[in-house]
Each structure stands twice: as structure tokens, then as C-alpha cells.
Amino acid sequence: MKEHVFLIEAAYGKLNLTLDVLGRRADGYHDLRMVMCSVELHDDVALTLGAPDGCDCRFEASVANPATKEILRCAQKDMNRACSEHVAVPAAPKTTPPVVADAHIGHKGTLRDDGIWPMRASATTNPASECAAALPQGEGNLALRAARAYFAAAGIDPGGCFVRICKRVPMQAGMAGGSSDAAAVLRALNRHFGAFSDERLREIGLGLGSDVPYCLFGGIALAEGRGERLTRLPDLPNGAWVVLCKPDFSVSTPALFGALDKMKEAPEARPGGPASNTDRMLTALRAGALPAVGAAMANDFAPVLAQQAPIVEACKRQLQACGALGAELTGTGSVIFGLFDSPDTAEAAASALRASVPYVQITRIRPATTVG
């Protein structure tokens, strides 16, 4: 029996501090200019390399229990057994317990190692658990495609690869959950095999999706073009807390781009110029002042989405009323987030929002990730 190699990599969620849509390109994509940041909230991506001949790359979505890392130990056992015995891994449960009380997850006031800030007992459910069963399978799954792309580019035969994802980052949220999972696969494999430079890894990532190059390294970055031209920016001051809320609605990203294109055609559209939002954010980041960063947060899709889902503006107003330095939509939604300079203020805001929003979570902004 071949020896198995078991790799685990964190896949951190992202937020848009700004998102400027500059116009449609000839290739059908839109030129973007935006500032993005990483948060501690993350999925765990586990890979098992090495299996008998005929065990091809496979994938299974799992649900991360917010209270424990036991899922990873189970994942390692199940994946090793699947590859060595050539059997199917048991199906993951469709739901997980709600966010649990402090007694189950450690001392209040300590950020857990999964990037979640412990909160008091609540009936709030985790949308990651509800959506894990809906993750694309086979070639439709970006993490599996990332593994295959890496092996193809490196000319490596891993002797089989099993990919399993423990979901925490909500799906269809504008937090690049799928792209982050793919980036985590590329990072984990490159740490193990060391086949590529950072630049080459970005090229492989861009072939998978526009957000993957950013998600490879994360941190605070200016992204331009489709999102592939990246410029590292100063980290936010210590103590940048985030409240995430995900209302119960869904939107079509192509439809939002279409509506935004029409809005921009109006004579009164964007009087400040197409890049003014991001320019203001760059000035705030260089100054290193968290209140200025909060005040500069902006997203071109927010006014478009507000026409279809008024709860977006309602959540932003409530976050600001609870002390957020700024509140904005990330990506094309549906997560709205507030920036706070204190965990106590963030938790008070989260408690207020939980009465009306099905998913509320507290986390922190994190620095860039190293690949080597």
C-alpha cells in the first residue's frame, strides 16, 4: 500500500472594502478596480495524496462543526480509507448545530482558530452547513479543478488525490468561498511539491477564476483588470473587527452587471469619477486610520441591489446605528458587513442583528498569507 500524504490548508474568506466597475471589456468581462481584504473566517481544505492505481481525483463537501476540529480527524481517516480500500466516503450530514454557546467553544473574548468570534447562545444557523450539500461536484468544483490544474502544469502524478472541504464561509455571499478553496488547494500543493513561483501560481489560479490570484495571498490589496492585477497595500491597524450578516435573498450576478451598466449610462451617474471610491480608500489606508477606512467603504453594486432587496440598506443602517465605522456590501452580495474597532461593540451589533437576519457572524481582518 502506498504511503498517503495528508495536507490541510485554511481557505480564508474575502471582503470588498471598495468595488468600482469601470466598464465592459471586449472579451465580455468588466474592468474592475477594488480594494479587498481577508478575514479570519475560513474553510478547511484537506487533501489526501497517494492511492492505488485507478483512484482518480475526487471531491466531497463536508460540514464544519463550529465547536470542534474533529471533522478534520474524521476526514483524514475517511479519505485514507477511501483511497486505500477504493470505497466511497460516507455522505456528509446536511446540517450542523447552530452557533453554540461560549461554554462549548472556549473562553469569551478569544478568537477561535476557525476565525469565528465566540458569541452567546443563539438559534442562528450556519448557512455553510445548509449549502455544503449543494457544492458543485466533479469538474464543476473549483477546488478539484485546482488540484488537477496544478498536477497538469507540474507534470506530477500524485497517485490519486481526494479533496474534502469543511465549509464555514457562506456560499453565494460575495466572500469568494469557492475561489478561496481553490487557492488553498494550490497553496497546499505548492508547499508540498514546490513546483512553481508565486507568479506562476497566480497564472494557474487566473485560469480557474478572477478571484483566485487574490485569494492565493490575501491581505489588503488593490485589484484591477478582472481582478488579476494586484498591488499589496498596508495592513489595517490592529483591532479591525467585522460583523457579517447574510439576509435571506439571492440575486443573479449577470443581471446585476446588466443593471449597473444601464445605471452608468445615465448622465447623472458617478459624478465623482469612475475610480473615486477606490482612490478615497487608498488615501485612508495610507493614513492608517480605521475610521477613515470605514468612511471610504463603497460598492458600485449596493445601489443596484438596494432596488431589488431593500434589506441590504436596512442592514447597513442598522450596523451603522450600532457603531460600525462603515457598512457595505461585499462583491455582488449577499453578505453585508460592518467594520468595528472593538469586539464589544461588534458583539453588541451582532446581537441586535440576529433578531432579523438569519446569519450573523463576527470575525477579524487578517494579514496576507505566505505560500512558502
Regions found by a protein language model. Name each.
Residues A143, A173-R200, Y214-L216:
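DPxDG-like acidic metal-binding loop motif
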Residues G194-L233:
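Glycine/threonine-rich beta-strand-loop-alpha-helix active-site module
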Residues S334-V335:
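Conserved glycine-rich beta-strand-loop-beta hairpin in the small C-terminal domain of fold type I
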Residues A152-R164, A188-L208, S342-A355:
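Phosphate-handling active-site elements
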Residues L17, V45-L47, A143, G178, ...:
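Residue-level signal for inorganic ion chemistry
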Residues K2, C37-S38, G155, L206-G207, ...:
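Solvent-exposed alpha-helices and their adjacent loops that cap or buttress functional pockets
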Residues M1-A173, R191-A195, L236, K246-F249:
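ATP-binding N-lobe of GHMP and related small-molecule kinases
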